Amino acid sequence: MTGQRTQHVHFLGIGGSGLSPLAQIHLAGGGTVSGSDSEDSPRVATLRARGVPIRIGATPGPAAFAAELAGADVVVASSALPDDHPEIVAARALGLPVRRRSEWLPELTAGYRLVAVAGSHGKSTTSAMLTLVLRAAGLDPTAVIGAEVSQLGGNALAGSGDVFVLESDEYGGAFAGLDPSIAVITNVEWEHPDVFPDEASVRTAFAAFARRVRPGGRLVVCGDHPGVVAVLTELGRQRPGNDVAVNDVAVIDYGFGAERHWRAVDVVTTAGDDMTRATVLRAGQEIGALTLTVPGRHSVLNALAVLATATELGVAPAQTLTTLTTFTGAARRFEFVGFWNGPADSTGVGPAGGPGSLEVIDDYAHHPTEVRLTLAAARSRARGRQIWTVLQPHTFSRFAALLDDFAAAFSDADRVYVTDIYAARETDDLGLHAVDLVKRVSEPAATYYVSWPELVERLATDVRVTLSDEASRGILLLTLGAGTITTVGPRLLAALGFSAAG
């Protein structure tokens, strides 16, 4: 293990959310890191600031590429790169072993008590919450998270303790080779239709992941979720609970249901401070009050997963509850962008806006369930304001497979804008368009297609017109998607005359 950690690893796609934290962890552990990427980014800048040589752009000639890889022991390639990518082919021609991220993770996490946090939704927030709790408890964990977390200084944390928190993705079988001491499954739904042909194949993948838990380990699951229940059934367990082990692994469930081992009741959002509050029960006994700055019932479920997991790692529930109160969220998870207080205002007012104002929130939601939960969280704190949603669909395959589910996801919105599909790794060979979604949405009636180039100008015009009405109680505007939609909020505020978040 020590030899592996001092290796020289060259990362292809080093600036991506999947590989950049692995590079940081390897570097912090005493290893040597180099890499390449197709484009510059803040993640690349962070690694360069730590002395990592990174080439940006097209693959160089054979001699230059060989010099670039001089001294490397292994090449780790992003899952986004095909096997015939020139740099993968060239690395193999040089005799270097090439590993995919999923193949490298078991080596990186060897020797740790691995906590693998999986699920179709909620992985990043749950991983971030758990890492913050374990750090506050003195366990000094190592962590790899799929989102930037300001309280942790980024998307990776290199600790000196024996616990490794890993956000574990099902895409491309990324979690298939892990051997966790604790596996967390937040929920299971059909996602990534480009690799999973149906919901059954997703459940099978999660069941295989659950079987990887080490003997004597723990499987922490949301017992309320039908997809999780189906996975447990596939594992041979007839229902969620805490009385039977699966393959010598204790199953610990959480949720809102009366039978859950960890349960939240009396969930409310208080109007005065927008805090989410609940009472937490363990085995039917009240253990304390949960207070979160992050909104929504789904955030309460994430917190329950953290409570269950941290307790198994020796952290007192009371201490976990105290730390969770301080959690401020992960990037692009109901993230505040800024306020604009109407046509007469060009300065903004910082952390709070009154009637007639615009508040912009950005969220990574790109699946119908995520859209629905984010809108429900927004409704809980809207206080009479209109909720406007701006969706950039992400990938043609997801859009096609889940089109009807998307159409039913907007009932908590007052107005919906759908812009052009973000292709990501795909090409448009399905003949679908964002207009196909607009035609299917029946609620709300105010649903529009706006092309990407025209989006910010159209939003700015509509916001000005709406907020010019003295009767307007204001707008809570959500930008949703996993692509470039995150740029829309700042650009909209700039177009309105204010660009600084409070």
UniProtKB/Swiss-Prot annotation:
GO terms for cellular component: cytoplasm. It is an enzyme of class 6 (ligase). The keyword Ligase applies. ATP binds at G119, S120, H121, G122, K123, S124, T125. Cell wall formation. Pathway: Cell wall biogenesis; peptidoglycan biosynthesis. SUPFAM superfamilies: MurCD N-terminal domain, MurD-like peptide ligases, catalytic domain, MurD-like peptide ligases, peptide-binding domain. It is found in: Cytoplasm. InterPro entries: Mur-like_cat_sf, Mur_ligase_C, Mur_ligase_C_dom_sf, Mur_ligase_cen, Mur_ligase_N, MurCDEF_pg_biosynth, UDP-N-AcMur_Ala_ligase_MurC. One of its GO terms (molecular function) is ATP binding. Pfam families: Mur_ligase, Mur_ligase_C, Mur_ligase_M. Keywords: ATP-binding, Cell cycle, Cell division, Cell shape, Cell wall biogenesis/degradation, Cytoplasm, Ligase, Nucleotide-binding, Peptidoglycan synthesis. Its EC number is 6.3.2.8. GO terms for biological process: cell division; cell wall organization; peptidoglycan biosynthetic process; regulation of cell shape. It comes from the Bacteria. This is UDP-N-acetylmuramate--L-alanine ligase. It catalyses: UDP-N-acetyl-alpha-D-muramate + L-alanine + ATP = UDP-N-acetyl-alpha-D-muramoyl-L-alanine + ADP + phosphate + H(+). Belongs to the MurCDEF family. The keyword Cell division applies. Its main location: cytoplasm. Coiled coil: none annotated.
